[in-house]
Amino acid sequence: EVMVSYEQTEKVLFSADAFGKFGAVGTDEPWPEEARRYFINIVGKYGAPVQTLLKKAAALDIATICPLHGPVLQGDLTPYLHLYNTWSSYQPETRGVFIAYASIYGNTKAAAGTGSSKSISVQPNGVRRPQL
């Protein structure tokens, strides 16, 4: 079990597992990539409690977020809060379709790529094993 705390003097939210991420400390990797993976694997099934946390946090003046895992978040916290709201409400970040295909002669591959649209991202991906 974990507990979230807020320190008023320094405006620090100690967020427990919320806003955590995988990865090594001191690397310049973008926060969303490993934070998304962390959310899916660690926090994902607790969407409703995260939504409650976000609603309570909206009433606080937060300057810093200190998760149990990952970097301390400072500066403009809006992108982090927005992504956590999206993830915890189980909404897609972008509209899209993933098409998994296997194509011996290339015809299925060609058909998989025909569904592109300006409003929806289509991501065809071959699942054939690479030749050794």
Regions found by a protein language model. Name each.
Residues 76-132:
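N-terminal beta1-alpha1-beta2 submodule of the flavodoxin-like/Rossmannoid cofactor-binding fold
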Residues 1-75:
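Metallo-beta-lactamase
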